[in-house]
Amino acid sequence: MIHVPVNANNSELAIRSLKKKMQRELVFRSMKMSRFYEPPSVKRVRKKQESERRHRKERAMRRRMMEE
């Protein structure tokens, strides 16, 4: 659940921060993906690509930590 505090009735700032948080958590992507039926074969390929991307990112982070 995403929580966004609204300070001094500043709703525009709250909406902007909500959009940023939703983008960070990939809410928009998951909403877009669930609009249409996705066959199991396509879903499997997409999940594998996402997993590879995540692992590459983790390896890059580890390398950066080792260099420092």
Swiss-Prot record:
<protein>
    <recommendedName>
        <fullName>Small ribosomal subunit protein bS21</fullName>
    </recommendedName>
</protein>
<dbReference type="GO" id="GO:0006412">
    <property type="term" value="P:translation"/>
</dbReference>
<dbReference type="GO" id="GO:1990904">
    <property type="term" value="C:ribonucleoprotein complex"/>
</dbReference>
<keyword id="KW-0687">Ribonucleoprotein</keyword>
<dbReference type="GO" id="GO:0005840">
    <property type="term" value="C:ribosome"/>
</dbReference>
<feature type="region of interest" description="Disordered">
    <location>
        <begin position="39"/>
        <end position="68"/>
    </location>
</feature>
<feature type="compositionally biased region" description="Basic residues">
    <location>
        <begin position="54"/>
        <end position="68"/>
    </location>
</feature>
<comment type="similarity">
    <text>Belongs to the bacterial ribosomal protein bS21 family.</text>
</comment>
<dbReference type="GO" id="GO:0003735">
    <property type="term" value="F:structural constituent of ribosome"/>
</dbReference>
<dbReference type="InterPro" id="IPR038380">
    <property type="entry name" value="Ribosomal_bS21_sf"/>
</dbReference>
<dbReference type="Pfam" id="PF01165">
    <property type="entry name" value="Ribosomal_S21"/>
</dbReference>
<dbReference type="InterPro" id="IPR001911">
    <property type="entry name" value="Ribosomal_bS21"/>
</dbReference>
<keyword id="KW-0689">Ribosomal protein</keyword>
